[in-house]
């Protein structure tokens, strides 16, 4: 049994070798000749999986170690009798922590407290739901927009997108990409919406590039609209608009979900799905794969305020690192993908063990995703 895996999927060789012969290959472009004698294909979002790629091949199963699936024609896979699995929620925590790092950085730069802002979340799934819980744990007001969930009657105080535009100081997008249909998200943030945002608002896109009309966004910024912008995803990728990059406040190379934990979850989820598909079901404990973090333990004295939270967050991950790396190579062919391929190791907040002498601080840190314990000072 031959299993092709994207060369940038961590732990893929270690895990899939339990099931068969493993060949690691580039994801973009994928070496098509390798598909001729392969039984399974494990990809990331850079590989377009469709009839053009797989027709006439012997592939019996496709796994994508990503939460999003717009790069996979799953309808064609089902029609062709090819098994398929994604990794829903695998990088949700990573994206939430990316958004937090960006907002805390902007708050420090521009002199505002997050607790004084209202955050509108568009798309309240694995990412948006976790973001809501962490923001509300800090006492930050959130407004939720998720038309599919609202129409299903799901529990939640869902608002219209118009309400978010009118009342939110921050609007952050966490939707799938749907190019048509009742819940179309392609260019959901078009020129009309962007121009209606509150003066000084913050616009964040860390889901799919075309959810925000990049040409319209550039036009608004060039005309002097008072708007801060955080973009991790672009239209198009990898050949992003450098003029737009030069005008946004945070620019990164589609790495919001790129924690070591998130990538490992993606690999383990598709491994478990494929092992079940072939009748050899196996489970993997994530902590058996992960190395010790660079910073493992720290002591926090006194209560937790936004300033001390920012220092803890940026000890684990400071988004300015990735912003600087992309700006350094912007416009150079191949460098966008190279940044993603050679991404520096990044951990999640849970990797940091925080000893607190304040019980409320420990409780809040745990609610925010840190690994905190209350140890009263003696």
Curated annotation (Swiss-Prot):
* Pathway noted in the entry: Cofactor biosynthesis; pyridoxine 5'-phosphate biosynthesis; pyridoxine 5'-phosphate from D-erythrose 4-phosphate: step 2/5
Q: Which spans are transmembrane here?
A: none
Residues binding substrate are 45, 66, 258
Write out the catalysed reaction. Answer: 4-phospho-D-erythronate + NAD(+) = (R)-3-hydroxy-2-oxo-4-phosphooxybutanoate + NADH + H(+)
UniProt-annotated catalytic positions: 208, 237, 254
Read off the InterPro entries from this record.
D-isomer_2_OHA_DH_cat_dom (IPR006139), D-isomer_DH_CS (IPR029753), D-isomer_DH_CS1 (IPR029752), D-isomer_DH_NAD-bd (IPR006140), Erythronate-4-P_DHase (IPR020921), Erythronate-4-P_DHase_dimer (IPR024531), NAD(P)-bd_dom_sf (IPR036291), PdxB_dimer_sf (IPR038251)
State the family it belongs to. Belongs to the D-isomer specific 2-hydroxyacid dehydrogenase family. PdxB subfamily.
Q: Tell me which UniProt keywords the record has, alphabetically.
A: Cytoplasm, NAD, Oxidoreductase, Pyridoxine biosynthesis
* Highest rank taxon of the organism: Bacteria
Entry GO terms, CC:
cytosol
According to the UniProt entry, what is the EC number of this protein?
1.1.1.290
- What name does this protein carry? Erythronate-4-phosphate dehydrogenase
- Binding locations of NAD(+): 146, 175, 232, 257
- Subcellular location(s) per record: Cytoplasm
One biological process term from GO is: pyridoxine biosynthetic process
Q: Does the keyword NAD apply?
A: yes
Q: What's this protein's function?
A: Catalyzes the oxidation of erythronate-4-phosphate to 3-hydroxy-2-oxo-4-phosphonooxybutanoate.
Question: Which SUPFAM superfamilies does this UniProt record tie to the protein?
Answer: Formate/glycerate dehydrogenase catalytic domain-like, NAD(P)-binding Rossmann-fold domains
Q: Does the keyword Methyltransferase apply?
A: no
Q: What class of enzyme is it?
A: oxidoreductase
Signal sequence residues: none
For this UniProt entry, the molecular function terms from Gene Ontology, in alphabetical order, are: 4-phosphoerythronate dehydrogenase activity; NAD binding; protein dimerization activity
Question: How is the subunit organization of this protein annotated in UniProt?
Answer: Homodimer.
